[in-house]
UniProtKB/Swiss-Prot annotation:
The gene is Rsl1d1. Belongs to the universal ribosomal protein uL1 family. Highly divergent. This is Ribosomal L1 domain-containing protein 1. The modification Phosphothreonine is found at residues 334, 344, 360, 399, 407, 429. It comes from Mus musculus. The modification N-acetylmethionine is found at residue 1.
Length: 452
């Protein structure tokens, strides 16, 4: 019983470790060491063949870089110092150190730091440049390019590192020779400097998904280069936001060579039955598309419902407003029709009857006018007082008594009275014509005398 109890925890631990490896795969499990060795041998053989053809031009060794391609562009820049098991510096490589201005003159500061390095036993640094000399002597563009080409590695004091980008220029960042910060006040200074020189810097920018890391040179042994690549890949699996799952592709190359593939997340050599990240991402994309389609359908339904509601409201508003306005409109139309009929009847029947001067109309004539027009005759207004707009009066035709047979045989023209559309408020009686036939007894006598 005790033996079984003692064996059970170990078995559970083993199961837990296997499940952890399956869930979160590390770089050592995913990478193939033989594939990396083959790629390193191909690149080193190519560089050696170039040296044999051009011995004078290519005397030194070429730098090797590991190109990392991520699935996603990171939101923040990542800069990590990666310690390597084997130094990436060659025997002929030079190291430059940028220091703080401890004294007024740059010569005094240079001598001070040389003594400090000798005290700690550091012999790898070839030149010391104070910050004051960097600002004055290397201000020109050509001087910066000369400085960049003369050294392989640049180290700077951590106290002045934030001031360097404005003075060294963009070419240091393009050539991947960014100065590495060192704490010159550390107690074990030799160990600190050797760690910076032998190691490399992991720079992953947020501008793109591709970045390169220096991992050695062609003069190194193949096994040493393979060890450095594995160390960098382990650091990637720890420092990246999604660990090793964020790595898409890994390539090995020099500055001017073709990139050779080392790792691909689509097909891995160790886990053949494992689900690839590509399929997982396709599933995620399908889910997102389904969710987006559902949201679109819901939005369309809501829009249709809102349109229906607005149309119903408009229809109900029109239906409620139509019966309220219809009786008034009908009344107005009927009133206008009645008024038009009255105006036409008055225009046709408002021609006044001629009455001889001096004779007042009798009651019978008044009754006759009332029967014809349906209104009592109004009293004449004074011509001096204008009532509204003036109306043109028709010339009344002469009576058969006034027209003498011997005066003229021509037919007398009948002037037609023009009526304007009367206003609804009041109707003025038309004025009589200016030329009137006189029917007085005196005139009759004169006419009879002429006829005789």
């Amino acid at each position: 019983m005790k033996g079984s109890a003692s064996e059970s925890p170990s078995a559970s631990v083993a199961e837990a470790t296997t499940t952890d490896v399956q869930v979160t795969p590390t770089a050592l499990l995913q990478l193939d060491r033989e594939q990396i060795r083959k790629a390193v041998e191909v690149i080193s053989n190519r560089s050696k063949s170039k040296k044999n053809n051009n011995e004078l031009l290519l005397s030194g060794s070429e730098n090797l870089f590991l190109m990392v391609i991520l699935w996603k562009i990171p939101e923040k820049e990542l800069r990590v110092k990666v310690p390597l098991p084997h130094s990436i510096l060659s025997e002929s490589s030079d190291v430059c150190l940028f220091t703080k201005d401890e004294f007024d003159s740059p010569e005094q500061t240079e001598g001070f730091y040389k003594k400090l390095l000798k005290k700690h036993g550091v012999n790898t640094i070839s030149q010391i440049i104070p910050f004051k000399t960097l600002k004055t002597e290397y201000k020109a563009y050509e001087a910066k390019l000369r400085l960049l080409g003369s050294f392989e590695v640049f180290i700077t004091d951590a106290r002045i590192r934030r001031h360097l980008p404005s003075h060294i220029g963009r070419h240091f960042y393009q050539r991947k020779k960014v100065p590495v910060s060192v704490n010159l006040l550390a107690k074990n200074l030799s160990k600190e400097i050797n760690r910076c020189i032998t190691g490399t810097v992991l720079n992953i920018s947020k501008r793109g998904s591709c970045s390169t890391i220096r991992i050695g040179h062609t003069g190194m042994e193949t096994e040493h280069i393979v060890d450095n690549i594995l160390a960098v890949s382990e650091m990637l699996s720890e420092k990246l936001p999604e660990k090793w799952q964020s790595v898409k592709l890994l390539f090995l190359k020099t500055e001017k060579s073709v990139s050779l593939p080392i790792f691909s997340s689509f097909v891995t050599s160790q886990d053949e039955n494992a689900v690839s990240l590509r399929s997982l991402r396709k599933q995620e994309l399908k889910k997102r598309k389904r969710e987006n389609a559902k949201l679109k359908k819901e939005s369309k339904m809501l829009r249709k419902k809102s349109k229906k509601a607005t149309s119903l409201l408009t229809q109900s508003g029109l239906a409620s407003s139509a019966p309220a306005k219809s009786p008034g409109a009908q009344k107005k139309k009927t009133n206008k029709a009645h008024k038009k009929q009255k105006v036409t009847e008055e225009c046709e029947e408002a021609i006044p009857q001629l009455v001889p001067i001096g004779e007042t109309p009798d009651k019978e004539n008044v009754k006759m006018q009332e029967n014809i027009t349906g209104k009592t005759p109004k009293s004449k207004s004074d011509p001096s007082t204008p009532k509204g707009k003036k109306r043109k009066a028709l010339l009344a035709t002469e009576t058969p008594e006034a027209s003498a047979p011997g005066t003229s045989g021509k037919k007398q023209k009948k002037d037609v009275q023009e009526f304007r559309k009367p206003e609804a408020s009041s109707f003025s009686t038309p004025r009589k014509s200016g030329k009137k036939a006189s029917n007085t007894p005196r005139d009759k006598k004169t006419k009879a005398a002429h006829s005789n």
